[in-house]
Amino acid sequence: MLRKKVTLSCEECHSMNYSTNKSLMSVDRITVKKFCRKCNKHTMHKEEK
């Protein structure tokens, strides 16, 4: 199955902290709660275009 590399960015400060792989079959954007080093707290991170 093919996978695409995507970047996750913080919804508060918009820094791109994480990268992950995503299936090409999924159409939904990834949203995950992760730790942001810039904000120094756990925030929601969403997939960038």
Curated annotation (Swiss-Prot):
Asked whether the keyword Repressor is assigned, the reply is no
Entry annotated with the keyword tRNA-binding = no
Q: Which GO terms describe its molecular function?
A: structural constituent of ribosome
State the GO CC annotations: cytoplasm; ribonucleoprotein complex; ribosome
What cystine pairs are annotated?
none
Q: Which InterPro entries match?
A: Ribosomal_bL33, Ribosomal_bL33_sf, Ribosomal_zn-bd
Family, per entry: Belongs to the bacterial ribosomal protein bL33 family.
* HAMAP family tied to this protein: Ribosomal_bL33
Q: What is this protein's name?
A: Large ribosomal subunit protein bL33A
Gene label: rpmG1
